[in-house]
Amino acid sequence: MQEFKQHTGLAVPLDSANVDTDQIIPKQFLQRVSKLGFGQNLFHDWRFLDEAGTQPNPEFVLNFPRYKGASILLARENFGNGSSREHAPWALADYGLKAVIAPSFADIFYGNSLNNGLLVVRLKDDEVDALFKLVEANEGQNITVDLEAKEVRAADYCFKFEIDDFRRYCIMNGLDNIGLTLQHADAIDAYEAKQPVWL
């Protein structure tokens, strides 16, 4: 997992509420065991006009030339609802997205995203509205997500957000559950060495 302290990138506005995990990454693409390769099928049923994924939908926002290379996704309320699948944050990250900003997220998706190094930021409705208007009105508009300061900045806007201190520490230091455990490897080994040997 990569460290995340601050990121500035092009933002793409997905103006849909209640986007579920099957829309993020449809179930027919969940056969992989690696985290890589899911990005090509992100929002498959919206991004493509055909099942094979060879005909891009020119009316879907991620296909607009002005948003090519976007690394921050703006979304609406209840993003990531539906069935629990870690493949959803994997697909978003593999596509190149570093953060998702929305008024609210489904709880399981929120946890899965942070556990996998995808920063999900909750802002107030009016703050998200302001960012949507800014990005839609200004081609090439970047947004900065500053995890150290717990701020989202763009143009003259500066919005504060909250995140659990433990999750913030893990993401800033690039630690997933395994990495966090390995930080305590010496203490674990010392504890194990003190245990009686059973035959």
From Swiss-Prot:
EC number: 4.2.1.33
GO MF term set: 3-isopropylmalate dehydratase activity
Any one Pfam family match given in the protein's UniProt record, by short name: Aconitase_C
This protein's record includes keyword RNA-binding: no
Alphabetic keyword roster: Amino-acid biosynthesis, Branched-chain amino acid biosynthesis, Leucine biosynthesis, Lyase
Cellular-component GO terms for this entry: 3-isopropylmalate dehydratase complex
Signal peptide positions on this chain: none
Record InterPro entries: 3-IsopropMal_deHydase_ssu (IPR004431), Aconitase/3IPM_dehydase_swvl (IPR015928), AconitaseA/IPMdHydase_ssu_swvl (IPR000573), IPMI_Swivel (IPR033940), LeuD (IPR050075)
CDD domains: IPMI_Swivel
GO biological process: L-leucine biosynthetic process
Pathway: Amino-acid biosynthesis; L-leucine biosynthesis; L-leucine from 3-methyl-2-oxobutanoate: step 2/4
Top EC class for this record: lyase
Reaction(s) this enzyme catalyzes, per UniProt: (2R,3S)-3-isopropylmalate = (2S)-2-isopropylmalate
Protein family per UniProt: Belongs to the LeuD family. LeuD type 1 subfamily.
Function: Catalyzes the isomerization between 2-isopropylmalate and 3-isopropylmalate, via the formation of 2-isopropylmaleate.
PANTHER family on file: 3-ISOPROPYLMALATE DEHYDRATASE SMALL SUBUNIT, 3-ISOPROPYLMALATE DEHYDRATASE SMALL SUBUNIT 2-RELATED-RELATED
Assembly, per entry: Heterodimer of LeuC and LeuD.
Name of the protein: 3-isopropylmalate dehydratase small subunit
Organism: Tolumonas auensis (strain DSM 9187 / NBRC 110442 / TA 4)
